Amino acid sequence: VSIRVGVNGFGRIGRNFWRAVAASGKDIEIVAVNDLTDNATLAHLLKYDSILGRLPYEVKATSDEITVDGKAIKVFAERDPGKLPWGDLGVDVVVESTGLFTDATKAKVHAENGAKKVIISAPAKNEDVTIVMGVNEKSYDPSSHTIISNASCTTNCLAPMAKVLHDTFTIEKGLMTTIHAYTQDQNLQDGPHKDLRRARAAALNVVPTSTGAAKAIGLVLPELKGKLDGFAMRVPIPTGSATDLTVDVSREVTVEEVNAAVKAAAEGPLKGILSYTEDEIVSSDIVTDPASCIFDAGLTKVIGNQVKVVGWYDNEWGYSNRLADLIQLVGRDL
């Protein structure tokens, strides 16, 4: 039986998630979407995508549905998520991807309306648990975890690398920088924004800004709580990012040891989440790669017990694939 999913917010992540489910063949059925945009526009943006290209299916919009390849998705335009009839639609899991309801005290309205589980596609507040697939999914408890955060795309890239380094060499402390594609939260032209750096034209600047990814690591790897920090440099590309992590470990190591540890994890317990390459790639090469982290072995640097590693990630596509994986995980025990 398919896991029935409702999506609240059909923006970049909502639409990427729809495409990731369609491409993966996972037993997930998206039965309803809520978005304040009109249906014709939503259908058009699902069919035509500047990064992912054109959907090879017929996409039609009616007043209350979008039909893709003959399959209907119910569409609502409710400003108040408390009015969404998830229970009546038999929705098992709601993906909360508006960016507006990242506080579980607000997101729980989906569960009150009949959804069995709610997954917030962002770092959250007051959530029951934050899960990064491949890192701490074993801590998921179906009996007590209803509102679940899938963390951020950057935490999903950072955590697998940090886990391997910590499990193998013991991280003492570290700093990270994500060289990150621009997002909807930046301005196309200079204009007002609460973050004066993000106020500036996204396609014309390297824009330093905050990321909670390093601090959030403690939510999924508790032994690293308070040991990592960092920031983001937003760069003028639409997707395809890289996390640069520098850590002090408990003993002196070599580049070969570090790369061997990551390669073993990528071919073993973290297969599909962490991938390993020795190719000399650039950001466009990892667009539409479903892994959370593509470890670039050629960039590993070591001085004594200090280690620098780099992992690439398609911040939209990789993350959307993890949403689908997390839904499969929670769908086992509904």
Which residue ranges define each predicted feature?
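N-terminal Rossmann-like NAD(P) cofactor-binding subdomain of oxidoreductases
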Residues: 1-199, 301, 325, 332-334
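Acidic, glycine-rich segments within the central catalytic cores of soluble metabolic enzymes
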Residues: 167, 171-238
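Generic secondary-structure signature for well-ordered alpha-helical cores
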Residues: 22-26, 163-171, 181-184, 211, ...
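Short clusters of hydrophobic/aromatic residues that line enzyme substrate/ligand-binding pockets
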Residues: 66, 131-133, 147, 188-189, ...
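C-terminal active-site/capping subdomain that shapes the small-molecule cofactor and substrate pocket
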Residues: 230, 242, 246-334
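Short, solvent-exposed beta-strand edge segments and adjacent coil->beta transition regions
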Residues: 144-145, 201-203, 240-244, 306-308
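Hydrophobic alpha-helical scaffolding
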Residues: 151-152, 206-208, 248, 313
